[in-house]
Amino acid sequence: MSIVYISIGSNMGDRLEYLQQGLDAVTDMGDIGVISSVVETPSVGFEGSPFLNACFTIDTQLSPAVVMQKLLDIEQSQGRLRSQVQGYHNRTLDLDMIFYDDLVLDTPNLTLPHPAMAQRRFVLQPLCEIAPHKQHPDDQKTIKALLDACEDDTPLSIYELKLRHPIYAKLSAHTYICVEGIIGCGKTTLTKILAQNLGYKTIEERFAENPFLPKFYREPKRYAFPLELSFLADRFNQINENSEQLDLFQSGTVADFHMSKSLVFAQNTLNEDEYPLFQQLYSFMSKSANQPSLCIFLRQTAERSKTNIKKRGRSYEQNIPIDYLAKLAKGYDQHLPFLQKRMQVVSVDISALDFVLNTEDLIHLLKKINVQLDEA
């Protein structure tokens, strides 16, 4: 498997849509890896509209010649004919292979690395975003070093919109998604990532506004029942508020909780007299609450969650016992059949992943999700 680095650009029509269609078409060649931000630059060397440009990687088993031909075919499918116009000109879609692994190649039809890359800031800046330490095989200079030395002073700005990774396409079939897992597993972070890439709005649990939460961590037995009741009521209200607020610009929702998490926590915090009453209240309220069609369950170890809790630094969480997290993990495992009867559930072990800081781990997580969506 080889890693190919590709630059993509357009300055005609709906520029971002041309970029997106080009990116989506490349998936026939292999798996898309990381994608840079989109940058905007004025046209250079001719009179034309500003360009949008980006860079991305693809893992492929195809040869360089086949990759190049397929890129040309994709350009042609979007109305670009390279042979008709020489020099700088307007382009519906431009796809250039920058690197194919560390291959150095010089043939009449293909030169690798791309011979003009070091002179083009619109290539180097997005490339540096996704591969700053990648070395040019000729002189061993990193992309960061090439960018720092680049004399191209063409104005460049970050475009307000991003390209959607094709890996999110299957998730877009679900207009209401929830993310679940124990405290500190990364639910809210993944919720925000999914919402941003799908163009959905978020429902984020309002734990910071709950006056009982700090008190509960100090005196669990005393404040367990009012805490669970307040969370249940707030989750119910948030779901209903979301269903009442029609947003013409955002077609779906990602929530960092499912309402039934109240049952998981209540089982671990309430006594034998309180829990049956709480169950009755939940059953009554949940009947009128909208349900997601997909739940993404993040399976995390208690030890890793404890580490994450320490990192995010919420003072009232710092003394959460690790055995309490272990009980929650066991409670969620027992709760999964309850969710599976009501929606599609994708359960992913993330104990070896850091999708918050590592883009490759995020892509790995999304691939795991897609595998299970395909199997359903």
For each feature predicted by the language model, list its residue ranges:
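Flexible, gly/pro- and Lys/Arg-enriched active-site loops
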Residues: 36, 44-50, 68, 73-170
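Post-Walker A alpha-helix
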Residues: 190-191, 195
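Conserved lysine of the Walker
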Residues: 187
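A glycine- and Lys/Arg-enriched "phosphate-lid" helix/loop adjacent to the NTP-binding pocket
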Residues: 262-331
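Glycine-rich phosphate-binding loop used to anchor ATP phosphates in small-molecule kinases
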Residues: 226-290
